[in-house]
Amino acid sequence: ERALITECWAETGKAPIGSKWVDVNKGDAKKPEIRSRFVVKEIATYKSDDFFAATPPLEALRLLLSMAASSGHHIKVEVLDARKAHLHAFAKRTVFVQLPPELSEPGYCARLVRCLYGTRDAPKRWEAFLAEQLVAMGFARGRASPCCYFHAALGVRCIVHGDDFVLTGRAAALDEVKAGMHERFLLKELGRLGGGQGELKELRVLNRVIR
């Protein structure tokens, strides 16, 4: 929300944090998918374990895919991408940032209502929001790896890497989970691996091709 720069100095004792537009390739060299993000330049100025967000080890993905492969053809692999992931989480700190150039106005800045890419706690806030939503859907969170989830009633397993989801389960169960996730997140469906009609023969997961 728009705020006066004088408010920023009064509440934080500092000038608004810098910001910029960044083009990010969410695809690869063969199939580029360029997205423009408005980011805050705060991460490089502060480091703390308090703002660390977990990522799953590669072994977790290998185990998930191995379990799916050994369970038979009825188990599918689904890949989803959360769009504008960090914007789903509300800001918990008072953060003032510079307005983007096209909206700049002398004497004004912006106070964050939701997290933005580049704020130091955005990954942690997204992780907490995501965990809350998945648990509300019936998933149990892993103890050894907080990025791993299991829905016992539906038999669906899920690994989260940042804003990417890899799920395994029966087709009907995956459809039910996806319906619940679409109600909570902006999602892009990247495909389902399997032998059925409309299913893919290969998928790219974390820059690795699986078949």
What role is predicted for each listed range?
Residues E1-R211:
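Long, low-complexity, charge-biased intrinsically disordered regions
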